[in-house]
Amino acid sequence: MEIRGALDLRKRQVLIFLVLLGLSRAGTESAHYSVAEETEIGSFVANLARDLGLGVEELSSREARVVSDDNKKYLHLDLLTGNLLLNEKLDRDELCGSTEPCVLHFQVVLENPLQFFRFELCVKDINDHSPTFLDKEILIKISEGTTVGATFLMESAQDLDVGSNSLQNYTISPNSHFYIKIPDSSDRKIYPELVLDRALDYEQEAELRLTLTAVDGGSPPKSGTTLVLIKVLDINDNAPEFPQSLYEVQVPEDRPLGSWIATISAKDLDAGNYGKISYTFFHASEDIRKTFEINPISGEVNLRSPLDFEVIQSYTINIQATDGGGLSGKCTLLVKVMDINDNPPEVTISSITKRIPENASETLVALFSILDQDSGDNGRMICSIQDNLPFFLKPTFKNFFTLVSEKALDRESQAEYNITITVTDLGTPRLKTEYNITVLLSDVNDNAPTFTQTSYTLFVRENNSPALHIGSVSATDRDSGTNAQVNYSLLPPQDRHLPLASLVSINADNGHLFALRSLDYEALQEFEFRVGATDRGSPALSSEALVRVLVLDANDNSPFVLYPLQNGSAPCTELVPRAAEPGYLVTKVVAVDGDSGQNAWLSYQLLKATEPGLFGVWAHNGEVRTARLLSERDAAKHRLVVLVKDNGEPPRSATATLHVLLVDGFSQPYLPLPEAAPAQAQADSLTVYLVVALASVSSLFLFSVLLFVAVRLCRRSRAASVGRCSVPEGPFPGHLVDVSGTGTLSQSYQYEVCLTGGSGTNEFKFLKPIIPNFQVHDTGRNMGEIENFRNSFGLNIQ
């Protein structure tokens, strides 16, 4: 079993290795951007949303981010605009040195689904460095016997810029004896050579001071200068010579400091001081001078600072041998740095998710990159995790991996996983790096809140105080943690005309319901709305319940007298013939109550009368009738005060004042008409109210009469008599309405309503009753009704 497990592991490693090779080849195609060095922080580089063909919202929702190969944050992606911005100033000379072009590699990572896009940022050079000489003074010794056209090597200037901004030319002044020549170089660098243009004469001028100027190709160009001191010597006809022009050595990068690298020696055929040779570096960069040193007498080159193959793979060192007479020779030492497996693989985590939902499959756990600074087999790597884990490694670009869950997990079986990422290189000896990740499984929100009832009925009495607690709703959630925390809310009402937001509110935490304002039963008897319970899971689950609020009526409205009108300006006078029989209907007090139920049950009673015992009021319908026969001794004018009282607790009441005029007889309606109609009809709200209320009461009264008549007809047959209203001859005003009706009285009577639209007198007049010619067999029934009327008032009329 162990051998088989080892073979499986070996197969997985080989497979990942092959995928890495394929991705390394496929990843060469990248999008290119460019930016000038030293550009300010926050400067615009490109719009990634447009280049990737994505919307800004999608870029933000998919958590786009920029990952550099060296894991440095040179760039910043603004998720609000999709713009790629500089996160820091870039110094091309520091980043790439003399390498051209200077390219920084990075990639854009998108999640849900996981995608990678490869990009390159080219840092363009600007002319921000002037040429500089390492030595402030260059000393050259030239024999006076030197022939015209002889050349002398000089130290070159250093310019950190590249391309056209780098060093381009040299000039020297004054140039009476010399000029500058720039020879062709295999490394394409510009080295100055001092050329003798006119023979020197030691006796005339033993020393010359010249200024060497180095000029770059920038716009505008920058320059640097150094002093060239020429000392004229006596004749020295042999220059030092090296056995070979090029020396090559290979040095492992772990060579200790102070170690010997090579020994370079030259020969000079001259004797004495002219045959003494000194060795120096020339045209040497700062890196060479920091890394190596040369013994000026022996020519031995030693290591001064550590070598690092991952930084510089080779050094080209120019060595000059100068004799005592000022003649010199040169050679080149090529030092090749040998790579050793001295760098273990590095694991850089770009993003990590330490908690994932238990029911999610193929969920991104970690995004990471691996890197080995070594080269060859020393830099090749194998990445793996433990077997028998429900996770797998998915390669993306070169040396980039994602750790993804393989299937939906079960938190109840195993709540956490410890994953070890192992990266091993193929060097000798093999080096490896391990990185541990602990993944926790979180519970999912799979239960919606449940109300204790599907519907609630709440009762609140009208005229309540604002912010009154009227009831509560409650819901529970079987989940745990935030998934079980319930928030309550009011849902939009189905009736769009219901101002729910101004009627009730709910406490989001405990479900308590409050009335926001005082409720009026007469305006709103009941209303329904829905409440929602939402948990705090993701995604949130919710449920709803129906709440019905019933407003209980309170006795807050007093009875309102519709007839007779109590405006005080035009008292209503009722005409009663002195020949009226007991029980004669004088008028009817009509009143309404805005309340409902027993609060709107009205009763009538005679409160005051000019002559008590002459008139009576029926308690249930407000009819005013004569209680006995009228006589000549009775006063002609009577004033009656009728009390209208509801059945509420406490009861409310109103009074109506009637004026009754006794007349000897009338055959035509006593109906005074207004002298002139108002010029303009003005709307009177009280008149409209009266018409509506009177029509409602009349309809109800008529229905009661019809029902009563139907019942009586079932018991016995009787002849129906119909009273008719006599209308005066001549033109009849259009604002008068003629109403005739038949009630349950023994007499048929007629009445007219005189309504005006203006502010004139509104009157309700009872006309002279029309006594029909009843048959003899109805006399007993009529007398029985009169007797009942007497008994209802407790009167004994002879």
From Swiss-Prot:
A GO CC term attached to the entry: synapse
TM annotation in the entry: 687-711
BP GO annotations: calcium-dependent cell-cell adhesion via plasma membrane cell adhesion molecules; cell adhesion; chemical synaptic transmission; homophilic cell adhesion via plasma membrane adhesion molecules; synapse assembly
Function: Potential calcium-dependent cell-adhesion protein. May be involved in the establishment and maintenance of specific neuronal connections in the brain.
Positions annotated as glycosylated: 169, 359, 418, 436, 487, 567
Domain Cadherin: 35-133, 138-242, 247-347, 352-451, 456-561, 568-671
Protein name, per record: Protocadherin beta-14
Cystine bridges: 96-102
InterPro entries linked to this entry: Cadherin-like_dom, Cadherin-like_sf, Cadherin_C, Cadherin_CS, Cadherin_N, Protocadherin/Cadherin-CA
A family per Pfam: Cadherin_2
First-listed, main subcellular location of the protein, grouped into a coarse class: membrane
Signal peptide location: 1-26
Molecular function terms from GO: calcium ion binding
Keyword Repeat: yes
SUPFAM superfamilies: Cadherin-like
Membrane topology value: Single-pass type I membrane protein
Residue intervals annotated with topology Extracellular: 27-686
Domain of life of the organism encoding this protein: Eukaryota
CDD domains in UniProt: Cadherin_repeat (cd11304)
Keywords: Calcium, Cell adhesion, Cell membrane, Disulfide bond, Glycoprotein, Membrane, Repeat, Signal, Transmembrane, Transmembrane helix
Subcellular location: Cell membrane
Coiled-coil region(s): none
